[in-house]
A protein has these predicted regions:
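Short, intrinsically disordered, charge-balanced linker/junction segments flanking boundaries
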Residues: 169-170
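Short, structured surface patches at the beginning of a domain
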Residues: 1-164
């Protein structure tokens, strides 16, 4: 029979070996559907991390109503990167590459920076863990696809505005 002190010691060792995990989510607009998605992403990450016995939730970083094409205006993203470089957590999980960055160079740059500090990124829907050997190649390919999707979306949004402008004689 294990006495109280031995059990407490075992529990402390378990806590010490848990990985601190941060999650990152982002939605690009403030509309109601996106807001619901934003809330559901946060709830999903919280539950996902809680279900993994080796993980401990550090924090959910979330940018709302901000495009993923540029990291400068994404306060929570930048705060997450700073916390990672500070050694506050070990791993970031995010839904997919396009939520993390819609620019190939940013994706590669930030995942390399994080890796230098021992922090991996798991892109769940893309099945990429940046601590895996072939991750950077797959990340580059998938990031390029996300960047192209962003460009096409931007064109679709701008096209009706441009057509209306031309038709109005301006």
């Amino acid at each position: 029979m294990i006495n109280r002190y031995e059990r407490l010691n075992q529990e402390l060792k378990m806590v010490e070996t848990k990985r601190k995990v941060a999650a990152y989510c982002r939605v690009s607009t403030d509309n109601e559907d996106q807001a619901n998605s934003f809330e559901s992403q946060q709830r999903y990450f919280r539950q996902y991390i809680e279900r993994n016995p080796d993980w401990e939730l550090y924090e959910i970083f979330a940018d709302e109503g901000i495009s993923g094409t540029n990291t400068k205006k994404r306060k929570e993203f930048n705060r997450m990167i700073a916390c990672a470089k500070n050694g506050d957590f070990d791993l970031i999980i995010t839904k997919e590459i396009s939520r993390f960055a819609r620019n190939t160079l940013d994706s590669i740059y930030y995942t390399r920076e994080l890796k230098k500090h021992g922090v991996g990124v798991i892109f769940m829907n893309d099945n990429i863990n940046t601590l895996d050997g072939d991750a950077e190649l797959r990340l580059a390919i998938m990031s390029s696809i996300a960047q192209e999707e962003s460009r096409k979306t931007s064109e679709r949004v701008k096209c009706p505005v441009l057509q209306a402008h031309i038709l109005s004689g301006h």
